[in-house]
Curated annotation (Swiss-Prot):
Pfam families, sorted: NT-C2, PMI1_PMIR1-2_C
Gene (UniProt): PMIR1
Annotated stretches, region: Disordered: 30-54, 224-268, 466-486, 1038-1063, 1124-1164
Name this polypeptide is given: Protein PLASTID MOVEMENT IMPAIRED 1-RELATED 1
PANTHER family linked: PROTEIN PLASTID MOVEMENT IMPAIRED 1-RELATED 1
Protein's organism: Arabidopsis thaliana (Mouse-ear cress)
Biased composition (Polar residues): 37-51, 224-263
Major localization listed first in the record, in broad terms: cytoplasm
Top-rank taxon: Eukaryota
Amino acid sequence: MSKVNSEESSSSQKLLKEVEKISEALYVNKNPRGSVAGSNKTPTKPLSRSNLAEPKEKKSFWNWPLRAINHVRNRRFNCCFSAQVHSIEGLPPIFQDLSLTVHWKRRDESLSTRPAKVSNGRAEFKDKLTHTCSVYGSRSGPHHSAKYEAKHFLLYVSLVGSPEIDLGKHRMDLTKLLPLTLEELQDEKSSGKWSTTFQLSGKANGATLSMSFGYTVVGDTRNPASSGSTQNFRSSSNVKQTSNNTGLTRAISAKSSLGNGKSASRRYDHSIVNRESHPLSQNMEEIKDLHEILPAVQSDLGSSVNTLYQKFDEEKVDPANESQFEFDVVTKHIEPVESISHEKEDANALQSELVTGNETVVPFEEIKKAGEVPTAGSDEVGAENFPLEEPLVNGNETDVPFELLKKAGEVPTAGRDEVGTEILPPEEPLVNGNETDVPFEELMITGEASIARSEEAVEIVTEELAPEEGNKISPKNEESVVPKDAEEVMNGEKDLKEMIMKDLESALKSVEMLEATASEDEEDRKKHGDKDKYFITPMKETVPSCSRDVAESVACEFLDMLGIEHSPFGLSSESEPESPRERLLREFEMETLAAGSLFDFSIEGDDPQLECDENFPNEYESDFEEGFDLASLVHDIEEEYQLEAQARVSHPRAKMLEGLETESLMREWGMNENTFQNSPPHNGRDAFHPADFPVKEPFDLPPLGDGLGPVVQTKNGGFLRSMNPLLFRNSKAGGSLIMQVSTPVVVPAEMGSGIMEILQKLATAGIEKLSMQANKVMPLDDITGKTMEEVLWETSPTIDIGDRDHVSERESGDASGFVRGGERRTSFAAKPKKFGSSSGNNNFDSEYVSLEDLAPLAMDQIEALSLEGLRIQSGMSDEDAPSDITAQSIGDISAFQGKSGCVGLEGAAGLQLLDIKDDGDDDDDGLMGLSLTLDEWMKLDSGDIGDEDEINERTSKILAAHHANPLNFIRKGSKGEKRKGKKGRKCGLLGNTFTVALMVQLRDPLRNYEPVGAPMLSLIQVERLFVPPKPKIYSTVSELKKTDEEEEADASDAKKEEKPMEEQGIPQYKITEVHLTGMKSETDKKPWGITTQQQQVQSGSRWLMANGMGKGNNKLPLMKPKLGSAKPGDKLWSVSGSGSKWKELGKMGKSNTHIRNPNVIMPK
């Protein structure tokens, strides 16, 4: 007996000396917080007592006490930030079959996803990373808005196996997600979600990382400096691929009590622990985060004790023992039901006490636990080797150091490592009750318990500890070891657990039937190997029992499925705000979320405990043994069903909106419900051909603007006309064009009767001269940047005074009433309605029309030819010119030499035309300058040219150029018979065949009516025929007003003229051919007013390529190789229509109704 007492006495003395040395070491280190802050460079080997007194580097000015003072007036919120990684898209081919990992780092804590394999430039992730921390907010922002302490995170992607490859790093402050006011953060916006994308760089340049960030407030404290509530936070864990890591481990560290005797702890969840990460750096990070949570002003002694336990944490056993301990203790001595309950247990106390009867275990056992509880075969405890059989110290012999702790107000309560993981050796005796006479009730947690020694496992229950006087800890659910004599009670609870697990299994089976994505998860697990190897979402450990293995496996799969896939946004990265689905979703938000906000909706289907890795305050946690409530599972199923029901209800609404949008577009395009009644089925490229529409059915062209028709007149007498939508039926981008035409003119007959003859005469003038003549005779207004209303407003005065302009031109021009080129304005231009579509007017059914209807009738053919002309200009036509012809220069020979006898003009009218070659005189515009408007041509044809002595040189040129008949063909030459001749024969001076020309310019209404391609010249060949008189449908000619003298003369000769009138008939006009020509300059000249050839090519080719109407040629014209047989130089290209046979060819199903003519090369 004396020997035993002597051994106990020596042991007590030994411990007393040890305590004294520890106290000295603590008081030498004057800045314990600074030492904690500088822990990043601490050596990995266990610390000895000799280096405890060494001061640490890095004494930061902004230390923890100052930060605590700074946060006194701020409000603290415990926020759980989450990062949902969706996918990486657009990866280069070099990443094929490689694996990528996304890292989310906050200070020393780094979270990462499972490796995802790249397939076809895409890597899919289904992982959610969470980080819980304190956020301090104040109302110091503008207008009393909230201002939060920044929480910076680093996001980057690494290549598995080659982490040194930099693919881009992104820094972010997730407090930017929080609402503008603190009240919103506390009330309706306590959670939120935000989706975004990040661009990768380096070798992954061009790839996009899609992620969703969220936050959830799990608790807030008004006065953080005095808060005694316990906060649970997530541990720092590093993911690492190891072949031995087939289960999930849990790292544990003990914490001391802080401030006013109230306990605080940091709980580690189930997470993957990097074996190579040093435990010292993890513990240092824990202390940093603990100071962030509770930045209370502490005494030096309290801080020293805290640092002491931290340093004991660092003195762990070697990694092999640590691994053995974690697997032995956690995986072998924890039941599955207990593992699930541990996820929701309270973490107030750092270690539960071990008492037996009235005998209390001395709290210096914490020193053992701080260095990891030794397993069998491990003798290391802290920095000393204590024998397992060594009895614990007597409480009376440790009064002195603990009274110091008591005076300082710092109670080092026993901190628990892991509930149910403490296995006491059977040989270790407990403290003798006779030797424990020191009252520790004020220092320890009140309660009695006993150690149940079991060789198989330690059973765990939870009991409610009522607060007693002197106890500063709030009443929470505490875990203690059940006495052995309560075995019957525990057996009953075991049965209850098994029943609950059976119910859970049946519920899981029914849920799995509803989950369509369960099979996808199984395939993903097969691809990535062991399902538990890379899981980020916390999972549970299993026991060797086969039945419990099955139950735990089902539970793990279901919980993982809830955490990743049950969120309505879990499988999608949320589409771009500009997409129609996103707009439709936002439109239905207010109906869907009548009782919540947008942020609430974004995580409504998620389990908050799983989102935050179950790091909720204790008031949200409950024990599994008290009853596993399946209401949460049913709630998730009901929410999913409600979402599907809402989608079914929203579908009719979406159809209604689609119908309203279609109706609005049809009104905008001038279409109605009868438009598609006769439409054939769309079964081919040419299904909607103009021939499919009945010719006699009216077809309205789309209007040019609100309240406007399809035709608007321009200031100089030309017109703007919308084009047939069927021409753009193959447009991929839905583009369309409008056509601008100039005032029609009749070109001189001297230029030729056929298209090739006319082109050769035009080419002889050269490209620059021809451009100048065409722009002067047929000018086109520049309407780029103007609206249709502005064009109409500028034209209105012109239309009102059109007739007066015509009269004034007669008076101000030459004696015969003909004025020159751009100086004239005709009454013919005051009738824009005639330029509508001929397919909608039954008046054009006949091939013969009046002179005024010639140009409107030709519009339908010209607009189709103009698109082919645009392709030829841009080099995108499928047809090439059959040949190239060189124009013959007329030299200095007079155009009409030797033809005076044929002309048959008397006096001044018989003068021959002068040389039409350009001699430098600006007034001489060549043959093109002798063109006539339709009104002028009708007057000249009727013989209204004045007296012979009034015919000047220009009139003679015009008559000769148009091959006029002799004047005595229509009158006797006397002055008195001049007017009678006009009445007796209304026309006949000019020939019965002539050519009408007009300029055509295409414009894009979507780009401010800018020109598309270069202007083109349309040539319409007309034939006149006198038909028998019939009821007049059109006004065929413009009659001059009759005077009283004319009426008297007509009355006297009425009988004489009656028979010739009947024989003569009414003149009608027929279109025989329609041609379209344009210039293709190979030099940097200005054809048709376009600045350069490059601009000419780009303006047309850009529109054709954007709308996919360049046919089979995908190359730009500048990229096409030049044929060796092509002759260099400026060219005139041309295409010909079929005149009146247009509709017949359409009925035959021929879509290509034009003919490509040979190119005419202009002389240099």
